[in-house]
């Protein structure tokens, strides 16, 4: 079977951009979609993002660092001492004014790594590193040894 995979990532609450990307992928004949995390925030999109995502054949999804930020804010892991944490608390408060809790539960269930096999080729899908979905280890100016963490004996 011929596969056309559209890779979605870093939506960050931008409903307009997600609509445009999905439309473009559909016009190009995408047969499946892989979502690499960061669905919510800081943009204003909420339920409509998940409605769009449920309208496409999403066959792999991993949790991104902003997804974790939302969960950490909801779980009371942020305080009022750090301005960044205050901002995330306020953004999450706005988010939860209309976001269905079923979507929060879905995000909470997402793994950090998904393994896929397509036509005999093995993929390892992550938002960043297999055990860490945040940080700058993969920036181009950094030591390339960090890229080795993306490959294992189950990845081509």
Predicted regions and their residues:
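Active-site neighborhood of divalent metal-dependent phosphoester bond hydrolases
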Residues: 50, 56-116, 122-125, 137-154
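Glycine-rich phosphate-binding loop signature in dinucleotide/nucleotide-binding domains
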Residues: 25-30, 118-119, 153-155
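General secondary-structure edge motif
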Residues: 5, 33, 75, 86-87, ...
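Short, basic, glycine/proline-bearing loop/turn elements
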Residues: 32-37, 129-135
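Acidic active-site catalytic centers that drive phospho-/nucleotidyl reactions
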Residues: 10, 38, 65-67, 127
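Active-site environment of divalent metal-dependent phosphoester hydrolases
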Residues: 12-17, 41-44, 67-71, 132, ...
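N-terminal active-site segment of His-dependent metallophosphoesterases
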Residues: 1-56
């Amino acid at each position: 079977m011929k596969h056309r995979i559209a890779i979605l990532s870093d939506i960050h609450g931008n409903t307009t951009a997600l609509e445009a990307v999905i439309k473009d992928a559909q016009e190009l004949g995408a047969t499946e979609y892989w979502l690499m995390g960061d669905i919510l925030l800081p943009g204003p999109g909420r339920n409509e993002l998940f409605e769009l995502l449920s309208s496409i054949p999403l066959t792999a999804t991993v949790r991104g660092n902003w997804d974790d930020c939302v969960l950490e804010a909801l779980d009371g892991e942020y305080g009022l001492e750090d301005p960044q944490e205050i901002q995330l608390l306020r953004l999450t408060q706005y988010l939860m004014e209309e976001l269905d809790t079923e979507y929060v539960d879905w995000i909470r269930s997402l793994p950090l790594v998904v393994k896929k096999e397509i036509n005999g080729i093995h993929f390892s899908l992550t938002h960043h590193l297999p055990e860490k979905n945040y940080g700058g280890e993969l920036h181009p100016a950094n030591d390339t040894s960090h890229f080795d963490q993306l490959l294992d004996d189950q990845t081509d």
